[in-house]
Design a protein with these regions (language model features):
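Membrane-embedded catalytic cores of phosphoryl/pyrophosphoryl-handling enzymes
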Residues: 2, 119-212
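Interfacial segments of alpha-helical transmembrane regions
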Residues: 12-13, 74-104
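Transmembrane helix-loop junctions in multipass membrane proteins, especially transporters and channels
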Residues: 78-85, 108-116, 177-181, 202-207
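Aromatic-anchored segments of alpha-helical transmembrane domains
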Residues: 20-26, 99-101, 165-176
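N-terminal transmembrane-helix/juxtamembrane module of multi-pass inner/ER membrane proteins
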Residues: 1-71, 107-129
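Alpha-helical membrane-inserting segments
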Residues: 30, 72, 102, 106, ...
Length: 212
């Protein structure tokens, strides 16, 4: 993975600079955009949306969505005796751990107030309070951290996972736990780690098919 990042360092730099610019542009508009995204009307339809958001957030964390992915991929690797699926499982685990760990370090370090915290909006500095762990979204980071490597390596399995991950990201905003920029930052971090991991798995499969 690190070799892939090094070989594509200019693309990585462009991603980092472009992503930083996007996030900085989003900060002043976060509350406005969050109000537009969230559906909080006292109607039956919105009640169903809120219930779906709660379910996605509950099952979309590391112990839920990610564990299901790891077990499913590992099961296929075992049943099919497939080195490809085994590598894909490892890539999903690494993507989750790398992205999730970085997201948690940033959350504790920046201390951004959650939208529902009733604290002054903004960054308050290092904090262990869950009310100040908004930036970035850990749920989104771990969900996309597992999905992106699989989507790059094996799209038929990865694309449905990306749809679920997108639902998890939406649920974090619908539940008033994160700002839009928190979610987008997590997706960018997942892309940074997930694409190289997925490419490694895909290339290893292509290499194994070459005739001797």
């Amino acid at each position: 993975m690190w070799r892939t990042l090094r070989l594509n360092r200019w693309k990585v730099l462009c991603l980092l600079l472009g992503g930083a610019g996007l996030i900085l542009h989003m900060f002043p508009h976060d509350l406005e955009w969050l109000a537009f995204i969230r559906q909080d009307d006292p109607t039956a339809e919105c009640a169903h949306l809120r219930a779906a958001a709660r379910a996605l957030s509950y099952w979309g964390d590391f112990a839920g969505f990610n564990t299901i992915i790891f077990v499913t991929l590992g099961f296929f690797a075992f049943i099919r005796r497939s080195p490809f699926f085994r590598r894909m499982t490892i890539a999903a685990v690494l993507g989750t751990l790398l992205t999730g760990s970085l997201a948690n370090v940033l959350r504790v370090s920046t201390g951004r107030a959650r939208p529902a915290s009733h604290l002054n909006p903004g960054f308050h500095g290092p904090s262990l309070s869950a009310k100040k762990h908004s930036f970035p979204s850990a749920h989104t980071a771990t969900a996309f951290g597992a999905s992106i490597p699989v989507a790059v390596a094996f799209p038929p399995a990865g694309m449905p996972m990306l749809l679920v991950s997108s639902g998890v990201a939406w649920s974090r905003m619908q539940n008033n736990c994160h700002h839009p920029s928190d979610v987008v930052t997590s997706i960018l971090l997942s892309t940074l780690f997930g694409v190289p991991l997925g490419l490694m798995v895909r290339r290893s499969r292509s290499g194994s098919r070459r005739p001797a």
